[in-house]
């Protein structure tokens, strides 16, 4: 493997894109299809492919099913994130992090960017 290309998400409505915009993502391409809309969003080389489709079933949350548990994005400063989050904690590597959910309930981890003195401690 040489890298991660993108993360694909399904959202129920167009307005939910604003959640990802608050995290810094910007729309770079939109494809309108007869059965859904696909929006590519990018921030610092991270691409999310967002499928807007109100007809998908809701996410099963408890108990968690096998498969993807959550996605994690790195942010510059957790105190400046403009979405409602859980209490900020420290992970096993000493980095600050928190969790939030997008409007459709997709769990999102937000992790504060390493500082130069952190070095490689969370790679």
Predicted regions and their residues:
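N-terminal beta-strand motif that seeds the catalytic metal site of vicinal oxygen chelate
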Residues: 1-15, 69-71, 118-123
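Short, conserved structural micro-motifs that define repeat-unit consensus positions
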Residues: 6-8, 40, 70-72, 95-99, ...
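Core segments of cupin and vicinal oxygen chelate
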Residues: 9-48
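A short, acidic/glycine-rich surface segment
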Residues: 36, 55-61, 117-119
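Short, charged/polar, Gly/Pro-enriched secondary-structure boundary elements
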Residues: 45-49, 105-108
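Mid-chain, well-packed structural core segment of small domains
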Residues: 63-87
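Vicinal oxygen chelate
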Residues: 82-123
């Amino acid at each position: 493997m040489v890298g991660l290309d993108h993360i694909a998400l399904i959202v129920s409505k167009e307005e939910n894109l604003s959640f990802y915009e608050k995290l810094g993502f910007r729309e770079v391409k939109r494809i309108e299809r007869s059965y859904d809309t696909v929006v590519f969003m990018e921030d610092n080389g991270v691409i999310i492919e967002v499928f807007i489709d109100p007809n998908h079933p809701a996410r099963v949350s408890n108990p968690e099913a096998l498969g993807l548990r959550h996605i994690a994005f790195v942010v510059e400063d957790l105190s400046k994130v403009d979405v409602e989050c859980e209490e900020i904690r420290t992970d096993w590597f000493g980095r600050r992090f928190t969790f939030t959910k997008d409007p459709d309930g997709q769990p999102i981890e937000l992790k504060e960017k390493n500082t130069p003195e952190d070095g490689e401690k969370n790679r």
